[in-house]
């Protein structure tokens, strides 16, 4: 049996528990926004279901690297857009060719919008997380924070959940990213 990591309802529902737990641990705060990293879109879709159940007015955003922003482009065109898969990228955990069919339907239903961050912003987010939050994030796990930091004015004065997901980074990549980040 193969279970799709993002294009299966059971997986999406399971991934939605991450947002549910965060909201409950924070005593159900009134959120204005949530920014969630997206590869196939399952984590965003599941989280969106949980968030919108508790807080229907919350704006939900996918976070992706600029060169792999298939969700952002798909939301703008209101149809799934495929990316050129003949190239790599810093955020290798998010490099899916297009949004999953089921997650795209869920995310579109809830009015999710897309954000994208540059590799430079991702490196700066990794440095910020390491220096200020004592978290060692992989590039894919830092992209939501990168989107927040790259769009400070958009989110200024709001209560925004930023999903930091993933710390699976080799020391070479981590060191290179920290060196590239602006101090």
Please name every model-derived segment.
Residues 1-183:
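PLP-dependent amino-acid enzyme catalytic core
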């Amino acid at each position: 049996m193969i279970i799709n990591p993002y294009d299966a309802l059971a997986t999406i529902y399971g991934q939605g528990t991450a947002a549910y737990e965060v909201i409950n641990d924070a005593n159900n705060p009134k959120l204005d926004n949530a920014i969630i990293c997206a590869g196939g879109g399952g984590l965003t879709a599941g989280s969106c279901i949980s968030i919108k159940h508790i807080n229907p007015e919350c704006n939900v955003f996918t976070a992706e690297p600029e060169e792999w922003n298939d969700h952002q482009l798909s939301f703008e065109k209101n149809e799934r857009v495929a990316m050129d898969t003949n190239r790599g990228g810093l955020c290798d955990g998010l490099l899916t060719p297009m949004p999953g069919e089921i997650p795209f339907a869920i995310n579109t239903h809830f009015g999710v919008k897309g954000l994208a961050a540059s590799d430079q912003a991702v490196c700066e987010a990794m440095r910020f997380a390491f220096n200020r939050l004592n978290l060692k994030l992989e590039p894919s796990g830092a992209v939501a924070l990168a989107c927040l930091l790259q769009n400070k004015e958009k989110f200024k004065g709001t209560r925004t959940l930023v999903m930091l997901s993933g710390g699976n980074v080799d020391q070479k990549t981590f060191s290179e990213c920290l060196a590239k980040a602006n101090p």
